Amino acid sequence: GLDHPITRERTDTNRVAVLVVTSDRGMAGAYSATILRESERLIEHLVEEGKEPVIYTCGRRAQGYFSFRDRPVEKSWVGESDRPSAQMIDDISATLLSTFLAKPEDGAVSEVHIVFTRFKTMVTQVPEVRRMLPLRVVDVEGPGELVREDVAATQERFHAEENAAMPLYEFEPSSAEVLNA
C-alpha cells in the first residue's frame, strides 16, 4: 500500500483543524448562517469523540461569529471571499498542511476538516463538511488510488445522493512519485 505523510492516520495528538469558509459581507446571511451551523455541528461531533477542535476562518462572517462568542481562532483570512487570490489560497493550504505535518509539540493536528458551500445552481448552494487530511488510501484496482474521506457528512450525503460516487484519483506514473514530487 501507499505510505506517505499525508495518508497516515495520526494518533500522537487529539487536535483537529477546522477551516470555516464564509462570506466577508452581510448580503449572504443565510449562506453564512448555514455554514456556521454546520461548523458548530462538526465541532460538537469532534468534541464528543474526545478531539480538540482548532478553528481557522476564511471570511469576516466566520471571524466575527467566533470572535463574538469569545472562541479562540488560530488564524483568519478576510477580505477576499468573493474572489480569493492565489496567494491567499496558497497561504491557507500551506498553513493547514504544515500544521498537519508538524510535530505534536509544535501544535500539530491529526486531521484537517473544511466547512464550505458547494454551489449547485443560482438558487441551490449546499453546505459541505469534508475531512481533507489525512487522505484515505483505497485499493480498488490495486495500490495507488486515493479517495477523500468525508467523515462528518458521509452518511448524510450517501442518503441524499445515493447514486453519487466518491471521487477517485488515479495517479500516474505512481501515487508515491506524485506525492513525493
Language model segments and positions:
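C-terminal beta-strand-loop-alpha-helix "lid" module of Rossmann-like NAD(P)-dependent dehydrogenases
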Residues: 1-181
